[in-house]
Each structure stands twice: as C-alpha cells, then as structure tokens.
C-alpha cells in the first residue's frame, strides 16, 4: 500500500506532491505549491523549499536555519482553509494551519501565504500571521474556539 501524501489531500504521495517536489511537474497554482512546500518540510527537503521561494527573498541564506529546524520539528498535519488569486491570476494567497511538535511541545502555524507567478512558475513570497482571540472561532474550520483547537 502506498503512503498518503503528508499534505492532507487523502491522495497517495506519488500522485499528489511527489511530482512537484522531485521536479517532474510545476505546481499549477498556489495551493499545490503550498501543499508541496509543506511536504518538503515533512521530508526535510531544503533544496525544494529554497527553489520555490521567490529569488528576491534570498532564501539560499536560510539553508542552515532550515536544516537546523528539521532536526527538532515533527510536522503533524496541514489544513488549507482558503485560497484565492489576484492581479489577473499572478498573485495568489493560501491560508492554512500547519501543526507540529517541537521540543516536546505542540504548536501550530496559522498563516496567509502570498505567492507570485513569474514565467509560468509559482513562488512563495512571504506570509502574514493573523491574530486570533482565544474565544474566536478557530480558522481551521473545526467549529471549536481557537483556545481549544489550534491556539493550544
């Protein structure tokens, strides 16, 4: 039996993010790039993360930091809860929750990532981390309060 993709799509990894991470295909949209980048974190693939960061971001300088982070972070799951495009389809946004453990503590990254399409290729630019009140509904869509879900 084949392994399911870590991106949470419920599709086999070989049919989902693998072709993007291994350069067999180019991610067709920001959501696929976001999911494949999450897989690269899970698989500890700094090369793919750097390759898919926009060149203006200078991501190659972050290689040592990325690799160091791999050693003590275990990724637990990804939930994409929104994606949209702007500027004629050349700028995209993906909002997600990525759960992890680090140093024995569970955490979550909640981010709205920004992507740019240049020469037929999508690149990660940056992300913003919205602030949520403890009693706000969790953005992951669970129906729980933030403090009882991703805010723990």
UniProtKB/Swiss-Prot annotation:
Pfam family, one: SEC-C
Family under the similarity heading: Belongs to the UPF0225 family.
PANTHER family linked: ADENYLATE CYCLASE-ASSOCIATED CAP C-TERMINAL DOMAIN-CONTAINING PROTEIN (PTHR33747:SF1), UPF0225 PROTEIN SCO1677 (PTHR33747)
Protein name as annotated: UPF0225 protein YchJ
Lineage, opening ranks: Bacteria, Pseudomonadati, Pseudomonadota, Gammaproteobacteria, Enterobacterales
């Amino acid at each position: 039996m084949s392994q399911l993709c870590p991106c949470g799509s419920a599709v086999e990894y070989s049919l989902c993010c693998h072709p993007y991470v291994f350069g067999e295909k180019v991610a067709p949209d920001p959501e696929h790039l976001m999911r494949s980048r999450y897989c690269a974190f899970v698989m500890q693939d700094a090369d793919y993360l750097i390759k898919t960061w926009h060149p203006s971001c200078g991501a190659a300088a972050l290689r040592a930091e990325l690799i160091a982070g791999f050693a003590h972070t275990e990724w637990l799951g990804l939930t994409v809860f929104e994606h949209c495009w702007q500027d004629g389809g050349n700028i995209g946004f993906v909002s997600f929750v990525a759960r992890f453990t680090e140093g024995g503590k569970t955490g979550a990254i909640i981010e709205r990532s920004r992507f740019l399409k240049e020469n037929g290729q999508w690149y990660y630019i940056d992300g913003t981390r919205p602030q949520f009140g403890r009693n706000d509904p969790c953005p992951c869509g669970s129906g729980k309060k933030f403090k009882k879900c991703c805010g723990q």
